[in-house]
Amino acid sequence: MEKYDYSELGLKAGLEIHQQLDSKEKLFCRCPTLIRDIEDSDFEFFRYLRATESEMGEKDRAAVEQTKIRRKYIYKAYDTTCLVENDEEPPGELNREALDISLGVAKLFNMKPVDQMHVMRKIVVDGSNTSGFQRTAFLASDGNIETSEGRCRIDSLCVEEEAAQKIEEIGDSIIYSLDRLGIPLVEIATAPDIKSPRHAREVAEYIGMVLRSTGKVKRGLGTIRQDVNISIARGARVEIKGVQALDLIEDIVRKEVERQLNLLFIRQELLERKAFVCEEIYDATGLFVDTKSKVLQKGIKKGAILAARLRKFNGLVGREVQPGRRLGTEFSDRAKTAGVGGIFHTDELPNYGITEKEVQALRDAIGANPDDAIIMVADEPEKSRLAIEAVILRAKEAIEGIPEETRKALPDGNTAYMRPLPGAARMYPETDVPQIEISQEYFDSIEVPELLTERAKRFASESGLNKELAEKIAYSKYLPLFEALLDTYSDNEHVNSTLIARTLVGIVPEIRRNGAETDNLTDEHFSGVFAAISNQEIAKEAIQDLLTALAKEPEITVQQAISNLGLSAFDPEEIENFIKNMVREKGDFIKEKGPAALGPLMGIVMKEFRGKVDGKILSHMLKREIDSFINQG
């Protein structure tokens, strides 16, 4: 049961899905799309970035805020990256393989391509692009999908280059890895047609399914990201970036609605109190010279403790806006853009070693009343000043309403401030890449793959898989291998579709949970295992042990693994003698249990011959011997 009536609240939401394409080369150079270990980096360099003007002479507001603090961006390069990633060489021609894949995606969403595609530069000065911009090209529009809550329009599809991956932050320096920079991706943006958290997940799932249906997108953590645009009536549009887990989307929408509602409640109370923000910044360093608070002592060593007074904000700065996050957290997020660690506010004091006496002395010194709140920042003088100014601005916004902003998704479904929403000044033409003609003939030549949902239905109807198994294999990364093996063993009595599917989406995950490095398993390994079963060299019960062994030692052949495990085929006479001897030894038990003795005795036989002989054959031989013993008795 949902907490809110989202229709009544006027919820509007849309998604932007960013999916890496599995092309051989990057978008504007011929480097491979390989993800490398940071330890493999063979050189590094650094950059300082600043906001530049658009063709209209304007600077993007998001870029301006991000460059207030001078940061050093360090880039790790590899023998699989080149001067294009370093921004030391102009980009090459746009990757035609990536363009073909993107047009195929556009077809699946019933979109209309542009007649002529132009590459643009999108200003990005967070260090994730060495050039200070991301190359992007608008490719198609006017698509749609059908959902349980009606049609959801697909507004646009763009082809973009992936950003560099952030490795870590050290002080004012940020380290990025260039292996990911330039990998082709598609950005799919929906219209604000999403009506509820569950609807958001449904739309995201469907778009993800369509993308995977191409068989030409990368898989794994970080290869697909969802941005969510959300607003409610009387609220504001907020873009939440970097939702990597599908399971988080519903929580993100719910908690953003909750945040905006709580901010509206706080605004109403501020208006009723006739609250306002004083712009004067006070130097409170001298008040805390003898403080016992270690955090304030560190601030004094850095240079300054600055404070600001928020008239009639007392009690509201500590008001919760999301689970575990308060209005004060919103203030702190803004302050952090100046490079400080956070803020102190009187709604949470005394605390952190700061005494009640020190808080009162601060109130007296700056003329704060009991119903006022005070904000403090302890850091270098310039950082502290910028941080306090950012908090003052955010406090004013709390009175005015909800600010439009870009926020980042947190692991618990909450969000934190990143930067203002970018404006039109963010985009300008890329003059180093020629435009590309998209003719109707070219678009018509792009083949459209079968959707995974349709493929699952086909597997169930044509291959005899149950619905659950058909869906699992259709959505699995092993889909191409499954189809190849299915074709090879279409008329084989020992290897059928169910055995192949259960191996790939049942046994493989199980041995992975048990610690096996299943990424070591190749198509050749699986082909060899099923060939051995087909030739009756091993029984299907041996699959788990055999794959575990191959995952541990991927360099050995299937035949070597069979030999190492002692799984070579047994002489039928040897099996028959074992069963006869066991039946004689267990004669009293068989007389007592009769035919019901089959189950317990089968366990003994399987322990001896598991993986070496098909269980059905063993069961048949044992039953025959038990029946013979009972009849003779």
Swiss-Prot record:
It comes from the Archaea. Its EC number is 6.3.5.-. The keyword rRNA-binding does not apply. GO terms for molecular function: aminoacyl-tRNA ligase activity; ATP binding; glutaminyl-tRNA synthase (glutamine-hydrolyzing) activity. GO terms for cellular component: cytoplasm. The keyword Endoplasmic reticulum does not apply. Allows the formation of correctly charged Gln-tRNA(Gln) through the transamidation of misacylated Glu-tRNA(Gln) in organisms which lack glutaminyl-tRNA synthetase. The reaction takes place in the presence of glutamine and ATP through an activated gamma-phospho-Glu-tRNA(Gln). The GatDE system is specific for glutamate and does not act on aspartate. This is Glutamyl-tRNA(Gln) amidotransferase subunit E. It comes from Methanosarcina mazei (strain ATCC BAA-159 / DSM 3647 / Goe1 / Go1 / JCM 11833 / OCM 88) (Methanosarcina frisia).
